[in-house]
Amino acid sequence: MTNPEFSSIEDFAIAMDEHDPLRNYRDRFLFPKTANGEHCVYLCGHSLGLQPITAAEYIEQELKDWAELGVEGHFQAANAWMPYHRLLTEQTAALVGAKPIEVVVMNSLTVNLHLMMVSFYRPTPARHKIVVESGAFPSDQYAVKSQIAFHGYDPASSLIELSPRPGESCLRDEEINLLIERSGDEIALILLGGVNYATGQAFDMKELRTQVMLRAARLASIWRMRPATCI
């Protein structure tokens, strides 16, 4: 199925939607309505996803268990609260391509990012810079800047934001490689999104990680996969 077979881009889009094996999943979510009462075209899933129709039912169940069981809900609720994260392990592992033993669902995204940087961002006077893509999600930027400041450095000089070339919207791999070659001795951490939440650019994580290891053995890298799993 190719675009030239259709009289307009709209016809092509409609045909593709009709043949999408996942199209029925659309009916599982609640869509905000426009001023004229029609369902809006929602393209903000990378920021806040639509509410699943079943969300209220699941929340009501937890409130019911809380009301009837109190503290005993940690172990006796319909979905016991203490081991609740285990209910999500198998699905999350499949989503991110990991083994279940490698996955745990916990905290908020920003808290987890802080925990990762506490472990992997070990700045020294000679090597203290962090590399992120320009236009990274705001809460990610705040976390990075706060970690830099916590260690006594200035985000104005210790944060490197990679930007696309003028007139382009996506970063080139060679630009990242060039930065590592030029400033690798000053960089303590490279922190990129698997997919850029604003542009949709997907990075070749395996290749970039290989280049990092070849060029700077002491350089750590973290991949933020939140945008890659919610777009």
Give, region by region, the residue ranges found by the protein language model:
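Pyridoxal 5′-phosphate
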Residues: 1-231
